[in-house]
């Protein structure tokens, strides 16, 4: 089976909502992937921040194998031990009493938050421009990207979108009728946009003053991605009412969670919400393996260390196509001086490195949390040539700006 053959089969059977993906991949191990033609790649996409421990990590493989061999699925008509254990472990890392609702994705986790908001009895919600919370209808109503919303109007809910990172705009939008405010601590899909210092603390104060719930969408930033268990923990004085999780939580398996605290934890009651596969024992066993491996192997420290190396290494290149690097931990955006992210993405792939272009001028890095020094060195060593190739593709004159 070749790349061409697998691509043709994909095109003949799957809907076109993604377009044709750029590369057929057949195997992964650690930070490396192989395509159907046998070419090897360094993975800095990580399944879009999903593969927290890389590919085929022994702890995840063992946990999944053991669980599927004993109890694969029973539905939420019955109790299984893995979701209970995972909920307990999550709450330990939050350091707070709360309740957990398990689902299968970030969009579903945010749908759960949407329903919790509705159950307050208040009709209004506030989200941010550029924010991304999923593509199901409730989550899409919260998403602040009109291009994704327009084909599906009208959307549910009374949602006001305000500029991201602007506490004054947020304060003006939140009223006594506001059920919730939902914010990403870092906007990943919008290009790894980091808010100004104090923004989350201001959001907490604004919501507390009006009785609105503060929902933090940590689907992309959570589970160690930024060097903290959850990114809000890097911000003093911020205790959210609801946190939504997915992506890295399952270590490659579909797993999401809506975690609620205080009064928000008691709003969902029997009949209000549910999912057949939520809390699946196999997915939850994988999630428990992910959390325990992060803790046991000290991966939060590794994330911080490799983040500094990557950020410093990229900026030290002094390449005219690089403006700066933003983000936190191993969620980094290389901001370009020109809108050539797509060209950089392709040049990197040609060089055997997979990166992502979420915005025309941003290259996003989301590698595994156990990223090794050798992979970082290989990336930094290849990057100048990748940037040169991208500029040459766009301009035909070698390095951008010369």
UniProtKB/Swiss-Prot annotation:
Positions of post-translational N6-(pyridoxal phosphate)lysine modification: 247
Keywords carried by this UniProt record: Amino-acid biosynthesis, Aminotransferase, Arginine biosynthesis, Cytoplasm, Pyridoxal phosphate, Transferase
Details of cofactor binding: Binds 1 pyridoxal phosphate per subunit.
InterPro entries xref list: AcOrn/SuccOrn_fam, Aminotrans_3, Aminotrans_3_PPA_site, Class-III_PLP-dep_AT, PyrdxlP-dep_Trfase, PyrdxlP-dep_Trfase_major, PyrdxlP-dep_Trfase_small
Compartments in which it is found: Cytoplasm
Classification via PROSITE patterns: AA_TRANSFER_CLASS_3
Cofactor(s) for this UniProt protein: pyridoxal 5'-phosphate
Gene Ontology terms describing biological process: L-arginine biosynthetic process
CDD domains, per the entry: OAT_like
UniProt-annotated binding residues for pyridoxal 5'-phosphate: 106-107, 132, 217-220, 276
Additional remarks: May also have succinyldiaminopimelate aminotransferase activity, thus carrying out the corresponding step in lysine biosynthesis.
Protein name: Acetylornithine aminotransferase
Name of the encoding gene: argD
């Amino acid at each position: 089976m070749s790349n061409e053959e697998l691509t043709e089969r994909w095109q003949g059977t799957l809907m076109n909502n993604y377009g044709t993906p750029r590369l057929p991949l057949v195997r992964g191990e650690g930070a490396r992937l192989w395509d159907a033609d046998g070419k090897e790649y360094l993975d800095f996409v990580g399944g879009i921040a999903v593969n927290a421990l890389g590919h085929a990590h022994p702890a995840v493989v063992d946990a999944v194998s053991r669980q599927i061999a004993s109890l694969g699925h029973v539905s939420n008509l019955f109790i299984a031990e893995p979701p209970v254990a995972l909920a307990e472990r999550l709450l330990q890392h939050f350091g707070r009493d709360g309740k957990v609702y398990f689902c299968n994705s970030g969009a579903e986790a945010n749908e759960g938050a949407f329903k919790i908001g509705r159950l307050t009895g208040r009709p209004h919600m506030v989200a941010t421009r550029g924010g991304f919370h999923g593509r199901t209808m409730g989550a899409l109503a919260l998403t602040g990207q009109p291009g994704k919303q327009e084909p599906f109007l009208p959307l549910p809910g009374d949602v006001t979108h305000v500029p991201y990172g602007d506490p004054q705009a947020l304060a003006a939008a939140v009223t006594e009728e506001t059920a919730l405010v939902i914010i990403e601590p870092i906007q990943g899909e919008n290009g790894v946009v980091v808010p100004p210092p104090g923004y989350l603390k201001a959001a907490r104060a604004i919501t507390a003053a009006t009785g609105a719930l503060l929902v933090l969408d940590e689907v992309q930033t959570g589970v160690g991605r930024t060097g903290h268990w959850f990114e809000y923990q890097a911000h003093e004085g911020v205790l959210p009412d609801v946190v939504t999780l997915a992506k890295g939580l399952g270590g490659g398996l579909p797993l999401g969670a809506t975690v609620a605290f205080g009064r928000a934890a008691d709003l969902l009651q029997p009949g209000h919400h549910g999912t057949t596969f939520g809390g699946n024992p196999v997915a939850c066993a994988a999630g428990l393996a992910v959390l325990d491996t992060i803790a046991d192997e000290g991966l939060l420290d590794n994330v911080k260390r490799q983040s500094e190396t990557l950020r410093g290494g990229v900026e030290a290149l002094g390449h005219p196509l690089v403006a700066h690097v933003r983000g936190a931990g191993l969620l980094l955006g290389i901001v370009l001086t020109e809108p050539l992210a797509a060209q950089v993405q392709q040049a990197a792939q040609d060089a055997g490195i997979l990166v992502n272009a979420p915005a025309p001028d941003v290259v996003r890095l989301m590698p595994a949390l156990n990223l090794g020094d050798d992979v970082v060195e290989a990336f930094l060593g290849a990057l100048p040539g990748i940037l040169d190739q991208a500029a040459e593709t766009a301009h035909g004159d070698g390095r951008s700006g010369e």
